[in-house]
From Swiss-Prot:
Residues 14-81 form the HTH HARE-type domain. It comes from Bacillus subtilis (strain 168). Signal peptide: none annotated. The lineage of its organism: Bacteria, Bacillati, Bacillota, Bacilli, Bacillales. GO terms for biological process: DNA-templated transcription; regulation of DNA-templated transcription. This is DNA-directed RNA polymerase subunit delta. One of its GO terms (molecular function) is DNA-directed RNA polymerase activity.
C-alpha cells in the first residue's frame, strides 16, 4: 500500500517513523533527514515548525527501529536495501586528505632568528634557589595555627537521630 493511498486523517494518526518507512518504500533511495522531515510535513499538511515537538522522538525512533540505517551525512535508508557485507563500506565515513602545503607554510613563517638563544652556563640556579628559600622563610606558621583554631569541632552536639537510635536499642533489650 503506497503512502498516497492513505487518507489525511489516517496519516495524522500514523507514527512519523511509519510514514518514513512508507516514503522509503516508495522512493527506493536514501534520503537526507531534513528532506525526510519536509516530505512528512507536506504529507501531513503542516509546517515543519509544527512538527518541532515530535522531531526528537522521531529521530530516536529512526535510530532504534531496526528497519532503518543511518548512512553518511545525515542520510537515512532502509536496512533491507543493503546486503550485510556492503553495510560497512557504505556507512564508514570518508577520511579527508590532509594538506601538506599548509604545514610547510607554517614552518616557513616561523623565523628562528626571532628567538633569543639561552646559554645554560649563564643561568645562575643558585640565585633562583635563594629567592625560593626567602619566600619560604616569609611563610608564617602562626597563620596555620589561626586557621586550625577556626576549624575546631564541637563534640557536644548530639544528633536527634542518634538519640532515637539509642532509644530503639533499649527497647530491643
Amino acid at each position: 500500500m503506497g503512502i498516497k493511498q492513505y487518507s489525511q486523517e489516517e496519516l495524522k494518526e500514523m507514527a512519523l517513523v511509519e510514514i518514513a518507512h512508507e516514503l522509503f518504500e516508495e522512493h527506493k533511495k536514501p534520503v537526507p533527514f531534513q528532506e525526510l522531515l519536509n516530505e512528512i510535513a507536506s504529507l501531513l499538511g503542516v509546517k515543519k515548525e509544527e512538527l518541532g515537538d515530535r522531531i526528537a522522538q522521531f529521530y530516536t525512533d529512526l535510530n532504534i527501529d531496526g528497519r532503518f540505517l543511518a548512512l553518511s551525512d545525515q542520510t537515512w535508508g532502509l536496512r533491507s536495501w543493503y546486503p550485510y557485507d556492503q553495510l560497512d563500506e557504505e556507512t564508514q565515513p570518508t577520511v579527508k586528505a590532509k594538506k601538506k602545503k599548509a604545514k610547510k607554510a607554517v614552518e616557513e613563517d616561523l623565523d628562528l632568528d626571532e628567538f633569543e638563544e639561552i646559554d645554560e652556563d649563564d643561568l645562575d640556579l643558585d640565585e633562583v634557589e635563594e629567592e625560593l628559600d626567602l619566600e619560604a622563610d616569609d611563610f608564617d606558621e602562626e597563620d596555620l595555627d589561626e586557621d586550625d583554631d577556626d576549624l575546631e569541632i564541637e563534640e557536644d552536639i548530639i544528633d536527634e537521630d542518634d538519640e532515637d537510635y539509642d532509644d530503639e536499642e533499649e527497647e530491643i533489650k
